[in-house]
């Protein structure tokens, strides 16, 4: 459960056969990284004759590579519990990801906050692993996911950063509140729902985030909704507005720069109306990854970083590659000129 324990245990029991079936996230707080945890576990098998590993589990498969790197005999590393194996894997370099976050962080003013998007399994990179790396980096103020279940998973994994739920479902509102997750409010009905849920639990000043529709036309309030919104929020003390935000539709393309600025100005007007009407400090944020690079002057109080974490720059910056897809070539064949391959016989 902490560094140094396996060597002591190995000297006591001197196992001759080792079996690895699972390595999870228990006791993660005692290790600097998952790699350090794997290395610690492998020290138990320093003098074993054979190690049997469950090749269906990614962490366990990685242990074999760790053992080779530590100088273990290739012959003792076997894969005996084979029910299902995958020869195509995606490797995620969390150090590179944090370096990319640091690049975007450095484009912002010291007091500007940063939200990182970890929705959809962190775009396939592993929401728990990515979130832990971000939390440990100290570079991030908020995380954001799409639905409540994603936020609950992060809470259970030990993530303590504030988490915004971008698409909160009505049926999940109790779960959101119970797990200290912060819902996006984007319509009259969504505000009524979160107020009712918070009041039912006897809560006061529960943080919510107000979405403004500045031109993307998916979710959000308009300028004409501000009087109703202000009146409703003043009448109910169960919730308080933590931030007001919007989404840019084309911040990554120069051809849409004029529209992007229109969005920003419309959003700013709505946000200022809301702040003055409620007479309270509220964080404002509209810039995404491209916006951070291309519209830095409009960083307001916070920015949201998503695809930029994975090495995508919209200014040509040399960011680090984070994800690598690896596979095994099944076959190499020589085909005569003019012959076709696969269905359709198209050339």
Model regions and ranges:
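A conserved, hydrophobic alpha-helical segment in the catalytic core
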Residues: 13-25, 55-82
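Active-site-proximal beta-alpha core segment in soluble small-molecule metabolic enzymes
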Residues: 89-91, 112-283, 299
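Flexible active-site lid/hinge loop adjacent to a nucleotide/diphosphate
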Residues: 1-54
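Positively charged, low-complexity intrinsically disordered leader regions
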Residues: 82-109
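Residue-level signal for inorganic ion chemistry
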Residues: 9, 21, 37, 59, ...
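A short acidic, helix-capping loop that chelates divalent metal ions and anchors anionic groups
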Residues: 25-31, 85-87, 251-255
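Anionic-ligand-binding alpha/beta catalytic cores of soluble enzymes and soluble regulatory domains
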Residues: 257-347
